[in-house]
Regions:
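N-terminal intrinsically disordered, cationic/polar leader segments
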Residues: 1-32, 42, 46-113
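Short, conserved glycine- and acidic-residue-centered signature motifs
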Residues: 33-37
């Protein structure tokens, strides 16, 4: 099962996304549920890098993308907060759809906004 978590650490001003595990909906290389979750993680990672290049982050984002694991942490500036939060929220919406359609393969812990 893929476990997805989206959360904030107000004391650090950071927004987090983590994915762990495998969907196991099909054999490796054929699992569309896993591929969908992976694509969402890669999209957030790229968007966060673009936001950093545009000066919307206080510091470089932390991005770790490995087989069965993804962690993305962004610390937005005051001006960039809404854009960064929206980026993570859109990915959370995608994971929500996956969880709704494949509840046996995906579990989501929602970002509180």
């Amino acid at each position: 099962m893929i476990t997805a978590k989206f959360y904030q650490k107000p004391s650090q001003g950071s927004i987090h996304m983590t994915l762990k595990g495998h969907a196991n909906a099909a054999p490796k290389g054929e699992d569309l549920v896993c591929a969908s979750a992976t694509m969402l993680a890669y999209t957030v990672a790229q968007a966060v890098q673009f936001l950093d290049e545009q000066g919307m982050l206080k510091k470089k984002p932390k991005i770790s993308l490995k087989e069965g694991s993804a962690t993305i942490i962004a610390t937005p500036t005051e001006e960039g907060y809404a854009m960064v939060l929206h980026t993570f929220w859109v990915a959370q919406c995608g994971i929500h759809v996956l969880q709704h359609n494949y509840p046996q393969n995906v579990q989501l812990e929602h970002l509180k906004v």
